[in-house]
């Protein structure tokens, strides 16, 4: 997302306003100097940590000599209130192709995913002429949940009939450009599906707006089905909430991550589905707890996964940020000293901790370092020019 943000205007806690345009304000190594519209200089030092080389929205984005507009993007409102934003638009594809391929098992689905990403090809096949615009994955439990809702809930009646058995699904969208390119993509995709263990004749294809809407309904129906199930469970115990991961891993850990999720959840006897943005190694594991005991058991598993994913070089929050509920996950990803650096960065912009209390950092003064940082500015920066960083 950040690559499409060209400029922002933000109001800081003291009332100062700052405008940052991409390419106009750069860090010098880890040091930065921003100038507000009133002429005040905001200076400080960026944290020393390195962000993981995966899709991530966990804490502040930090890099050597970085464009300082990226500090504010994904900062969860902890540095300033963004009042204006300028975006870069891209031309819509002339022909968008939507597809859903059904595979016999997870390994077959991963073979197709890697072929679509041009990482590894089944024997005797060629890569597609273009990379997909998106690749999504749905495990057999997710499809079973969809099928159950399709049969019992009129709201899901527009779903196309799902195949019999317990297949897995890979959804992909492409820029077809024109009829010739669309045919080349679909012909090649059919071969890849067959060589990955699927049947090209079972594959759903959409080439027009109406059919694309049906495929997109399928793509987005699974989270809604999970919400319906969780709402039913909440009637017996209102403490139960939806439990869904937002973790991403480096490509080489995609298989181990899926193995870990399935083994741990199956051994624990929990009801779950797995779906999400497999093109970026970013899957959502959703547990549907039937009791508060299962809810607590799932939360403990999630914490363990956060530690493992972090050790692999992944992110505990790939797209939804840390917020307030995932603060413990951030502690699994970064050390106390790195969190202190984040807090110092926030204090440069918000010395009194007025913005989004509890986001990224705990709002409890004895469980986080925010109050200490506010009272003791980082070295080399004035008390009113320190900022802290956020991951939730």
Model regions and ranges:
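FAD-binding subdomain of flavoenzyme oxidoreductases
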Residues: 1-122, 372-377, 382-392
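Short, ordered loop/turn segments at secondary-structure junctions
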Residues: 23, 140, 321
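C-terminal substrate-recognition/cap domain of FAD-linked oxidoreductases
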Residues: 73-75, 81-304, 308, 312
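Short coil/turn segments at secondary-structure boundaries
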Residues: 206, 230, 321, 357-361
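Short, highly charged C-terminal tails/helix-capping segments
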Residues: 207-210, 322-327
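Conserved PLP-binding active-site segment of the aspartate aminotransferase-like
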Residues: 286-293, 325, 329-333
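Alpha-helix capping/hinge segments and adjacent helical runs
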Residues: 312-322, 347, 351-355
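Activity-critical C-terminal alpha-helical subdomain
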Residues: 327-392
């Amino acid at each position: 997302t950040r690559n499409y943000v060209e400029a922002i205007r933000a109001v800081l806690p003291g009332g100062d306003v700052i405008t940052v345009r991409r390419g106009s304000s750069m860090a010098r190594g880890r040091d930065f100097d921003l100038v507000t519209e009133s002429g005040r200089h905001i200076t400080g030092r960026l944290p020393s940590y390195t962000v993981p080389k995966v899709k991530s929205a966990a804490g502040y984005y930090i890099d050597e000599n970085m464009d300082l507009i990226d500090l504010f993007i994904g900062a969860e409102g902890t540095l300033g209130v963004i009042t204006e934003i300028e975006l870069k638009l891209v031309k819509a594809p002339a022909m968008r192709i939507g597809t859903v391929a059904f595979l016999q098992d997870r390994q077959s689905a991963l073979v197709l995913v890697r072929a679509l990403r041009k990482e590894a090809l089944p024997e005797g096949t060629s890569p597609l002429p273009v990379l997909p615009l998106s690749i999504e994955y749905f495990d057999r439990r997710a499809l079973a949940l969809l099928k159950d809702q399709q049969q019992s809930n009129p709201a899901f009646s527009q779903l196309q009939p799902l195949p019999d058995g317990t297949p897995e699904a890979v959804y992909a969208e492409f820029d077809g450009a024109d009829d010739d390119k669309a045919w080349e993509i679909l012909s090649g995709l059919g071969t890849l599906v067959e060589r990955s263990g699927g049947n090209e004749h079972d594959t759903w294809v959409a080439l027009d707006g109406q059919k694309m809407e049906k495929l997109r309904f399928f793509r987005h129906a699974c989270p809604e089905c999970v919400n319906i199930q969780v709402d039913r469970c909440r009637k017996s115990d209102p403490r139960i909430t939806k439990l869904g991961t937002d973790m991403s891993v480096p490509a080489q850990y995609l298989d181990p991550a899926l193995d870990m999720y399935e083994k741990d959840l199956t051994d624990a006897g929990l009801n779950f589905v797995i779906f999400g943005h497999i093109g970026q190694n970013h899957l959502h594991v959703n547990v549907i707890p039937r009791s508060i005991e299962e809810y607590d058991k799932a939360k403990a598993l999630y914490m363990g996964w956060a530690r493992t994913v972090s050790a692999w070089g992944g992110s505990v929050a790939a797209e939804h940020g840390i917020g307030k509920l995932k603060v413990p996950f951030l502690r699994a990803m970064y050390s106390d000293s790195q969190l202190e650096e984040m807090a110092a960065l926030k204090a440069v912009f918000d010395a009194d901790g007025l913005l989004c209390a509890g986001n990224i950092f705990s709002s409890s003064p004895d469980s986080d370092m925010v109050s200490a940082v506010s009272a003791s500015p980082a070295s080399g920066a004035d008390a009113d020019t320190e900022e802290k960083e956020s991951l939730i």
